[in-house]
């Protein structure tokens, strides 16, 4: 599956637009990791526990978006974007979305 954040796929012609596709996940760290992250936020620096959590969430959201596109018969996704939001304390949602297309 070709995925790009641009409106076209270099070297390919879009022959059909299949519409919006998306994938999302909500992730939270367990209490031990959350305590460590809180302590690290006091002294400054990267909060590696959350960096890892969001990286895993983005990858899962991409997989789910790709599955949605395959279900619609697409072989590419253009205009890929991410959205992140806090849905509750210590939990974040990551959504990947884009436009499913067929390219040749």
UniProtKB/Swiss-Prot annotation:
InterPro entries: UPF0145_dom_sf (IPR035439), UPF0145_YbjQ-like (IPR002765). It comes from the Bacteria. Belongs to the UPF0145 family. This is UPF0145 protein DehaBAV1_1363. It comes from Dehalococcoides mccartyi (strain ATCC BAA-2100 / JCM 16839 / KCTC 5957 / BAV1). The lineage of its organism: Bacteria, Bacillati, Chloroflexota, Dehalococcoidia, Dehalococcoidales.
């Amino acid at each position: 599956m070709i995925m790009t954040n641009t409106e076209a796929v270099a070297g390919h012609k879009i022959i059909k637009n299949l519409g919006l596709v998306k994938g999302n996940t909500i992730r939270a760290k367990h209490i031990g990791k959350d305590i460590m992250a809180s302590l690290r936020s006091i002294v400054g620096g990267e909060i590696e526990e959350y960096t890892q959590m969001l990286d895993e969430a983005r990858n899962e959201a991409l997989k789910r978006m790709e599955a949605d596109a395959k279900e619609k018969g697409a072989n590419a996704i253009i205009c890929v974007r991410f959205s992140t939001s806090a849905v509750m304390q210590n939990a974040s949602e990551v959504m990947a979305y884009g436009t499913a297309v067929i390219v040749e």
